Curated annotation (Swiss-Prot):
Cleavage of precursor form is necessary for function. Autosumoylated at Lys-18. It comes from Homo sapiens. This is Small ubiquitin-related modifier 5. PROSITE patterns: UBIQUITIN_2. The keyword Transmembrane helix does not apply.
């Protein structure tokens, strides 16, 4: 047996991991929880859009955070280092405000 036959292709294994589905927990301000199954390479814009449709609110009315950092539409679970059962927190977007004098 040659060395080429004995070694698995690491390139192929890397692709398999990237295409793997993970389950993410999305928790709203009211403590409601929805589970989503997504691929590691899928932009999280799809998850955000789906969550907002289920809640009946516009996407731009909510902000999504992972480990305290805002999630951009083009972020993927792979880029953010997400793992199985990780939590995404959802908050109402707050704009403006002013001080009282």
């Amino acid at each position: 047996m040659s060395d080429l036959e004995a070694k698995p292709s690491t390139e192929h294994l890397g692709d398999k991991i990237k295409d793997e589905d993970i389950k993410l927990r999305v928790i709203g301000q009211d403590s409601s929880e929805i589970h989503f199954k997504v691929k590691m390479t899928t932009p999280l814009k799809k998850l955000k859009k789906s969550y907002c449709q289920r809640q009946g609110v516009p996407v731009n009315s909510l902000r999504f955070l992972f480990e305290g950092q805002r999630i951009a539409d083009n972020h993927t679970p792979e880029e953010l280092g997400m793992e199985e059962e990780d939590v995404i927190e959802v908050y109402q977007e707050q704009i403006g405000g002013h001080s009282t004098v």
